[in-house]
């Protein structure tokens, strides 16, 4: 905090006393109280540079980010040379996710003020947040030439390497940042490092970081406010209690955000207004799954708003999503506050989060409570831990009532399966094994999950299957070049001849589905199952064998199998999983019966019946809104039979 000389006039002394009170509160970490004191000082002396800067800092620390921006702008107007005010303004713009504005502002800074470490650090973040990763790395290198032991810059440079698919370089940057000391950011970086190491199939290093994650989470109080990388916890851990705590710790960061003002709406006979918020309304798995739901929403009963804060990739999928929406609202670059205010202005009855704690999420919007009922759905396979999310939309398999204690939200169970599917997805076309690089006479075990989902325990089972089935080959997806050599090393250590491994390149959806049908059995991963990949395999007519754990992410494939009438392929232990694969491998007739059933399922099974699914979802949305309109608090809404179409 700034130090000022004690003033002489009575009015100035009163302002100074308030400032001193604010400084004392800030030293205790009581930023909300500090802000009140600094604002009291400003009411007495509204043009004081020091009071403005201190108010901006306290507002930023207490999550009053819009106020922080206002105070920093006022401080700069009074003193354009204030370095502190400049970087407080940048920090506020970044927190508001106004990334393009942040970058433009930093590039407008005069050359003689661009020499410091703080400037290059801020510029690196702005470049990173606008997708300019190579330039961001160069900016962070400028920081490190000035201070090589800047832990945050090593970490942030790792993020840019990660986005460039250079996972091993990212890991080294994360590790360096941790060694140098990242303070309250350490847990988040342990999560990022564990995830990056799993993506590279460097399992010894990943296991070390996963243990660090668990140890830190276990040692924190439930009310701590830390960044936790929830997606890493949800996908790498099979412990639902641990996942809930990690998500709760993350949600605590939003505790002091004030709700936006909502205008009450007496709906009466008017349609229910449903809003979906996402950054993924383009060629993305979420849109691939949701497109037909948007097209089939009953416009006589629902007024649907799609709020997009992600990129427009000009794809056919983007055009399809826009055409399906009654209201498509473009909000890319808008702050959380601005998005929340727009949603509140639209008087949305039910707002649905399609991101959870994934990249480009806007949980800060939901923390502002722009809608009276808020739910999370599809994008994040686990609990948000957030008190401002009322419901998690699942089904009796992924969110069974017996697991309710593992979720902060109330359960909203669809009748069959939570995952929507698009009947307009490409149907498999004829393709030969030779064209896909597969032997005609082999039993092909297909493991097309991303590399991070392959755990050592699962690979042990797969290698055992190759030993037990001499004519089998293992068909894996070559997601990125850095994972393959490490996975091949793990296979070799387990005694597998690498000639029995086939690598599949990444393809477009139509070709991918066509080649998937060439396999004999899809073998799933644990503790994070195949999700869209599993429904693609079932659509292609391929039997899927899975192992269901105790978490949402480990039960998804089981839910999909239930929805196509193949629950017997969902096992409850790795031993049973292995035995099921062996039984199918030895029984070509059984595999053919399953294939025939799946071909029929494309047109008849609930998993692929988009009309039925949409009515089921709408019935659930109606139950949520009706409960609120009756003055009742959110409660578990368990599955009921899907409405007839």
Please give the residue ranges for each predicted region.
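Donor-sugar nucleotide-binding helix/loop cap in glycosyltransferases
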Residues: 523, 537
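Short hydrophobic signal-anchor/transmembrane segments that target glycosyltransferases
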Residues: 293-300, 456-470
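Glycosyltransferase donor-sugar binding loop
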Residues: 307-313, 473-486
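Short acidic/histidine- and often glycine-rich active-site loop of Leloir-type glycosyltransferases
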Residues: 554-565, 570
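Alpha-helical solenoid repeat scaffolds of the TPR/TPR-like class and their adjacent stem/linker regions
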Residues: 1-439, 450, 489-496, 508-519, ...
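Short hydrophobic beta-strand element within catalytic cores of glycosyltransferases
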Residues: 543-552
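Short Ser/Thr-rich beta->loop micro-motif in glycosyltransferases that lines
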Residues: 355, 524-530, 548
């Amino acid at each position: 905090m700034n130090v000022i000389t004690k003033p002489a006039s009575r009015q100035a002394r009163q302002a100074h006393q308030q400032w001193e009170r604010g400084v004392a509160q800030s030293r205790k970490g009581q930023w909300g109280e500090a802000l009140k004191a600094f604002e009291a000082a400003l009411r007495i002396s509204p043009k004081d540079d020091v009071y403005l800067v201190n108010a901006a800092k306290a507002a930023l620390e207490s999550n009053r980010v819009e106020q922080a921006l206002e105070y920093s702008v006022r401080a700069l107007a009074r003193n354009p040379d204030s370095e502190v005010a400049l970087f407080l303004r940048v920090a506020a713009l970044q927190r508001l996710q106004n990334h393009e504005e942040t970058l433009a502002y930093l590039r407008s800074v005069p050359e003689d003020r661009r020499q410091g470490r703080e400037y290059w650090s801020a510029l690196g973040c702005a470049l990173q947040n606008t997708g300019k990763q190579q330039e961001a790395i160069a900016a962070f290198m400028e920081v490190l030439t000035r201070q090589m032991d800047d832990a945050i810059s090593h970490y942030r440079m790792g993020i840019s390497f990660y986005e460039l698919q250079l996972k091993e370089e990212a890991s080294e940057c994360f590790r360096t940042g941790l060694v140098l000391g990242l303070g309250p950011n350490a847990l988040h970086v342990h999560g990022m490092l564990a995830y990056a190491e799993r993506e590279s199939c460097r399992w010894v290093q990943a296991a070390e970081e996963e243990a660090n994650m668990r140890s830190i989470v276990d040692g924190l109080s439930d009310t701590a406010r830390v960044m936790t990388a929830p997606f890493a916890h949800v996908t790498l851990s099979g412990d639902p209690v641990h996942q809930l705590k990690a998500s709760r710790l993350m949600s605590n960061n939003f505790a002091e955000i004030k709700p936006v003002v909502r205008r009450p709406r007496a709906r009466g006979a008017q349609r229910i207004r449903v809003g979906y918020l996402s950054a993924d309304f383009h060629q993305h798995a979420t849109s691939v799954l949701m497109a037909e739901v948007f097209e089939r929403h009953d416009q006589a009963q629902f007024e649907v708003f799609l709020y997009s804060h992600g990129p427009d990739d000009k794809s056919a999928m983007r055009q399809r999503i826009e055409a399906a929406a009654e209201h498509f609202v473009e909000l890319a670059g808008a702050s959380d506050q601005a998005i929340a205010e727009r949603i509140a202005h639209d008087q949305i009855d039910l707002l649905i989060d399609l991101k959870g704690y994934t990249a480009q999420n806007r949980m800060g919007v939901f923390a502002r409570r722009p809608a009276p009922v808020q739910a999370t759905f599809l994008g994040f396979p686990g609990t948000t831990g957030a008190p401002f999310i009322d419901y998690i939309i699942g089904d009796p398999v992924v969110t069974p009532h017996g697991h309710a204690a593992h979720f902060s939200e109330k359960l909203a169970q669809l009748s069959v399966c939570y995952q929507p599917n698009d009947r307009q997805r490409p149907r498999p076309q004829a393709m030969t094994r030779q064209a896909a690089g597969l032997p005609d006479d082999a039993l092909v075990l297909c493991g097309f999950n991303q590399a991070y989902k392959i755990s050592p325990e699962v690979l042990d089972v797969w290698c055992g299957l190759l030993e037990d089935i001499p004519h089998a080959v293992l068909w894996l997806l070559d997601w990125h070049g850095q994972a393959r050599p490490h996975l091949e090393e793990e296979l070799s250590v387990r005694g597998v001849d690498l000639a029995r491994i086939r690598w599949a390149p990444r393809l477009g959806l139509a070709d991918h589905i066509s080649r998937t049908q060439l396999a004999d059995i899809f073998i799933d991963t644990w503790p994070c199952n195949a999700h869209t990949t599993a429904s693609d395999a079932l659509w292609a007519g391929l039997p899927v064998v899975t192992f269901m754990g105790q978490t949402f992410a480990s039960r998804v494939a089981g839910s999909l199998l239930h929805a196509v009438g193949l629950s017997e392929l969902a096992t409850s232990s790795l031993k049973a999983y292995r035995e099921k694969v062996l039984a199918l491998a030895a029984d070509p007739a059984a595999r053919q019966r399953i294939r025939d059933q799946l071909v029929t399922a494309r047109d008849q099974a609930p998993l692929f019946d988009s009309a039925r699914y949409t009515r089921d979802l709408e019935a659930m949305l109606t139950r949520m809104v009706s409960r609120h309109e009756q003055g009742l608090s959110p409660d578990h809404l368990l599955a009921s039979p899907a409405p007839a179409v």
